[in-house]
Amino acid sequence: MVVKVGVAKLGNIAAGVMAELLLDERADREDMMTFMATSGTKLQKEDVDRVVSNLKAWQPDFAIVVSPNGVLEGPVGAREDLKAAGIPTIVITDDVTTKKEGWEALKASGFGYIIVKADAMIGARREFLDPVEMADYNGNLVKVLALTGAFRKLQLELDKVIDQVKAGKKGAELELPKLVLNSDNSTKGEFTNPYALAKARAAYEIAQAVAGVNVKGCFMTKEWTDYVPIVASAHEMMRAAANLCDQARELEKGCDGVIRKPHKKTGEIVSKVALISKPE
């Protein structure tokens, strides 16, 4: 059986950059296939509708809706539309736990969700953010989510759903993830060196704090001479977090302790630690 996984990318968060790639890192899995439709940078209704229409036409076994601020009208409408079409749906978004009404509604719904608290909004001010700065920020954030363990935890949750479909479950029978990724559960079981763990935890906490700084710079500060240093400082924080992740990775390499968990062609996950060894 080949499991069909649909991915709707609405706007951009770092988790969306890698969502489907994490499931098939060498493009050789034979048990699943993905189809991704994107609205690009936009979250307008017509853009969202185009994405959802393409996804429904493909008829996936389940869908993933990745977006910033997953309690906004566009992402909410997308998942409701997919649900109405009988497609089980998992929401992947940044930290919406502070948005009380929308967060409570999501928790009470039948949707799965993975909240990535460190997937912090960018410093989107014209006087500061150009295409190069945007790409640099996202590169640093992807590194943080990869090397702290957040991406692995996200990938494992999605693989659990794929395994359920392979076992014959479908529709409402699927148990969808309900997970809020923080510095505790993201880093758990990811490191053999305690100093590497400490650096990764620090990196996650810094990245998570970036969102609040960028909110201040983008929405709470009026004068451009005031908000430019604020958003610039947020990007420096993300760069510092990425540097801590590099340091953590190097510590793990130094003691030959990097944990690797590749997929086999069958979708089975195997693991290894020593560099010169075979995964089992």
From Swiss-Prot:
Domain of life: Archaea
Keyword Oxidoreductase: yes
GO terms for MF: ferredoxin hydrogenase activity; methylenetetrahydromethanopterin dehydrogenase activity
Documented EC number(s): 1.5.98.1
Keywords: Methanogenesis, One-carbon metabolism, Oxidoreductase
Top-level class of the enzyme under EC nomenclature: oxidoreductase
Keyword Oxidoreductase listed: yes
Alphabetized Pfam families for the sequence: MTD (PF01993)
Catalytic reactions of this protein: 5,10-methylenetetrahydromethanopterin + oxidized coenzyme F420-(gamma-L-Glu)(n) + 2 H(+) = 5,10-methenyl-5,6,7,8-tetrahydromethanopterin + reduced coenzyme F420-(gamma-L-Glu)(n)
A Gene Ontology BP annotation from the UniProt entry: methanogenesis, from carbon dioxide
Pathway(s) per entry: One-carbon metabolism; methanogenesis from CO(2); 5,10-methylene-5,6,7,8-tetrahydromethanopterin from 5,10-methenyl-5,6,7,8-tetrahydromethanopterin (coenzyme F420 route): step 1/1
InterPro entries for this protein: MTD, MTD_sf
Family: Belongs to the MTD family.
Job description of the protein: Catalyzes the reversible reduction of methenyl-H(4)MPT(+) to methylene-H(4)MPT.
HAMAP family documented for this protein: MTD
Protein's recorded name: F420-dependent methylenetetrahydromethanopterin dehydrogenase
Organism: Methanocorpusculum labreanum (strain ATCC 43576 / DSM 4855 / Z)
